[in-house]
């Protein structure tokens, strides 16, 4: 079995309604991770050793019984998808096999589920299995998949009602505080501690009621890089050292006063001494670069021209309006 297994699912399957235990989800994730997304193969074998290797917190002593019990339950599980025109319900697997004394299992996926797992040409989400390998909560995995769908966007807003439906707790936790304490907070903590994502949750009210949640999604790698760079860059000198009226003309930086020009020149030198690659410059410092270069035609940067910094911001989904960062 290959390392770094990748789970690929149609978005409609991620947003489907189904109830599975943590071990059932692990088995399906392991099975889907071994699939060739371009193939129609429906039968998959795996061993106890495979399962324990991919999910290290599983005890080798109890793994066989856990898998056997979970596969037995999966056989009776179904998934329900819904669109504007219809509701469809189908089973995950069509057969299950135990190879006695071999520590090996085989499951066959149903014809109905296969279009949601293979031959996908769009509207799908993928992630590495290792990023959910240490999760101990079904809710953590489901929320992880739901926000991974919107990872490139950077945020996803979900109504509380819809989230409860997806998490199969629509008949529990009538008070949001209970849902937050028992489901959301533990899941977000687990995602932040054990996966590749960093997630913050913003509560959106309608009147006095929490109506929806905005999941702000970041990558640990990018966040760590940004924090490291910001921490390392020396702070700019205080403007008071250059006079009482150090002012930027935001509509036309060239019209900024002389004191601002002196301050900007020294700040630009700090940036030049710190950065060696434009792709590693933080968004705020890309803005600073542009402003400092725009204020005086004699100012230069080894990283590029004003347009180069604007283009880098555009790649990241930002533009400058009156010298301020604005999301495109």
Curated annotation (Swiss-Prot):
Domain of life: Bacteria
Gene3D superfamilies, per database record: Winged helix-like DNA-binding domain superfamily/Winged helix DNA-binding domain
Key word Membrane present: no
One of the Pfam families matching this protein, by short name: Rep3_N
GO molecular function, one term: DNA-directed DNA polymerase activity
Alphabetical UniProt keywords: DNA replication, Plasmid
Record-level GO BP terms: DNA replication initiation
Similarity-based family: Belongs to the initiator RepB protein family.
Descriptive protein name: Replication protein
Source species taxonomy: Bacteria, Pseudomonadati, Pseudomonadota, Betaproteobacteria, Neisseriales
